[in-house]
Design a protein with these regions (language model features):
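Transmembrane helical cores of multi-pass secondary ion antiporters/exchangers
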Residues: 1-410
Length: 410
């Protein structure tokens, strides 16, 4: 007779084994993103009677925030070169902060109108959770094509910061919806400034303390453990202080990935930390996409209607992204550094959705006693539809688009 903990551990071992097998098959057979196959396999196997229910995994919406998000965000921030980031800070900030807010309004407004649910917190919540981008596969194409470094920094930097902005906006809207206190623009702006500013200061502070410790060590395994502790500790402490854990992790990751990498880490330590977090990134991404497949089984009876809503969501996602990208790019070229016009098409089409929207979808709470309970199944299916379309349609056509525009060497 298995104990509950043995049963849960066995389930996760099986899921990780499945993730590895699916990833190997996807690499050998096709160039489609392995995450798509993981989701489809997760959805497919969930209908077999021997496959455990999603609830048996011990999975809960809080697990996503406190276990999955910190290392995923830290890994992205650790690899970001601060000097290059600062060179393009204004376009990155414009795309990532006002851009995400405008995209949330446009996407939410469109799906509220076309999807027939009206304009309110539900469509805005969806607009916020689908706004963060995840250009991992696009950046791989950039490396293969030897694309301009400045273009890579623009795309990667925007993704890093719009992940943070999207999560903060999502959290503010979710609390307004669940708490029932209503929504005001002024209050939301103040809350945004408070949680972002507080998260940044806290992340910088704990990151600096970690740097001081790392500078006195020369043990790569211990230093790697400190980086992992920093990712989770910064997130947990920020959330306990009611500021943004996402911003805190990004700030700490940027500090350690630049200042710490240069002044406190040996080459062996850097290699250890990079390899470790890349492995964690793969494992957590794999689990996320299998879990969304298992989660969709819970709502298999509503899979017919929401696909109509998903079509509206995909259109809204693309329209919102297009308006923000082309408008902001045009304005920035008028008042600042001139960048090639062809880049705006890459920035628009390269805004793939991936692990962060999936994590936010899975973070939607159950049994809130609000209107969210009625719309959660629809949001899950529509969100999955957006991510699926993004990874398949956009991810597989990036290389031909770059070839057509004469960017890089493809």
């Amino acid at each position: 007779m298995q104990s509950p903990i043995e049963h849960t551990v066995g389930i996760y071992i099986g899921l990780l084994l499945l993730a590895c097998i699916v990833s190997i098959i996807s690499k050998l057979i096709t160039r489609l993103p392995y995450t798509i196959f993981l989701t489809l396999v997760g959805l497919g196997i969930s209908f077999f009677p021997f496959v455990p229910d999603i609830k048996e995994t011990g999975f809960g919406h809080e697990l996503i925030f406190f276990v999955f998000l910190p290392p995923l965000l830290f890994q992205g921030a650790f690899h970001m070169e601060l000097n290059r980031l600062l060179k393009h800070i204004w376009p990155i900030v414009c795309f990532a902060i006002p851009g995400v807010v405008v995209s949330t309004l446009l996407t939410g407004g469109f799906i509220g109108l076309v999807g027939g649910i009206g304009f309110g917190l539900i469509p805005l919540l969806f607009g916020a959770l689908i706004s963060p981008t995840d250009p991992v596969s696009v950046l791989a194409i950039f490396r293969e094509a030897n694309a301009p470094e400045d273009l890579r920094i623009l795309v990667e930097g925007e993704s890093l910061f719009n992940d943070a902005t999207g999560v903060v906006v999502f959290t503010i809207l979710l609390h307004a919806l669940i708490d029932g206190g209503g929504f005001s623009i002024g209050g939301s702006v103040l809350a945004f400034i408070k949680v972002c500013g507080g998260g940044f200061l806290l992340g910088a502070a704990v990151g600096w303390m970690a740097f001081l410790i790392l500078r006195r060590l020369n043990e790569h395994l211990l230093e790697n453990a400190i980086c992992l502790l920093l990712a989770y500790g910064a997130f947990w402490l920020a959330e306990m202080m009611h500021v943004s854990g996402v911003i805190a992790v990004v700030a700490a990751g940027l500090l350690i990935g630049n200042h710490g990498r240069r002044l406190a880490m040996s080459h062996k330590t850097i290699e250890t930390v990079e390899t470790f977090f890349e492995s964690i990134d793969f494992l957590l991404n794999s689990l996320l996409f299998i879990l969304i497949g298992l989660e969709l089984r819970e709502y298999s009876e509503v899979l017919v209607f929401p696909w109509q809503f998903a079509a509206a969501a995909i259109a809204g996602m693309l329209i919102g992204r297009a308006i923000v990208t082309y408008t902001f790019y045009w304005a920035l070229n008028k008042i600042g550094t001139k960048r090639p016009k062809s880049w705006k098409h890459i920035i628009f089409w390269g805004g793939l959705r991936g692990s962060i929207p999936i994590a936010l979808l899975l973070h939607l709470p159950l049994n809130t006693g609000t209107v969210l309970d009625n719309y959660r199944p629809i949001l899950l299916v529509a969100g999955f539809g957006c991510v699926f379309f993004s990874l398949v349609a956009q991810g597989t056509t990036m290389a031909p688009l770059m070839r057509r525009l004469g960017i890089g060497r493809i």
